[in-house]
Amino acid sequence: IISNLYDYVTGVEVGLGSNGRKNRGGHQMEDLVESYLKKAKLEYYKEMYLTEIEEKWQVNLSAISAEGTSTKRWDFVVKTDSCIYVIETNFYTSGGSKLNETSRSYKMIAEEAKNVKDFKFVWITDGAGWRSARRNLEETFNVLDTLYNITDMENDIFSKLFK
């Protein structure tokens, strides 16, 4: 119900509702990924900032943090005996600029992560939105060997990845 014509015209009420709908898929994807992390009996951390990772495991992530200027928060972090894995998850029901920008951003993170010893960036994404951004996804896939989707999780990728 629209309670204020001015807010509707300026997008306040519509925007808030739309943002909630847009984020719903992302939260559902996070929940799904978490269920597979639990199923694989992995020790993991949720919503961990880059600085928290640096402090907890005494690792220098300046190559990823733009020399300490980034405040990146990862959806999940898995720490094994030999590696720190940072995980980003998302699900896109439709295409658009957000999806393209995310792909470009994650491609850059993948390239930067290669400069950090015993550190891997993992991206788990899915959804029909990728049909319209196939080229962007392919470009990222070419530099990120840890790019997965829901089918990969169903096929137990975590037991192979987190050794």
Identify the residue ranges that each predicted region occupies.
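Domain-level recognition of nuclease-like catalytic cores that cleave nucleotide substrates
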Residues: 122-163
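Short, well-structured alpha-helical interface segments that form or flank functional binding sites
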Residues: 24, 28-32, 71, 101-108, ...
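Interdomain/boundary linker segments immediately adjacent to catalytic/signaling cores
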Residues: 1-41
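Short loop/turn segments at strand-loop or loop-helix junctions that form parts
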Residues: 9-11, 81, 87-92, 126
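Active-site beta-strand-loop-beta-strand hairpin of nuclease catalytic cores
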Residues: 69-86
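Catalytic cores of nucleic-acid endonucleases
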Residues: 90-135, 139
